[in-house]
């Protein structure tokens, strides 16, 4: 089994860098997703550390706190949960935008395919797969 760090990628809602708002509040919903991802991975027998920042701080402060927590563990992968606000589907089209995993290093592709498989086996959310972005700023 593998060992992972997982975190919701923003500060709590209304406290500093709390992510996208509009149809939903990213910092609220990404914590729900993060908790479910952790539950699913643990159910598969993996060791998972929750490295979420729950403090009121800036974007850089949040990132620094997350990195410090993640660096406390020797893991096979670090996962940051974010929600893409690009659809702007205020009226609804009865379709989910889906979930994708963006990687910047091919070495993690096999592990992340397994991660996505576990997530989607237990979900109705569309699987948008693993995508490569060497300039990933996530």
Where in this protein do the model-derived segments appear?
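Active-site-proximal helix/loop segments of hydrolytic enzymes
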Residues: 4, 27-138
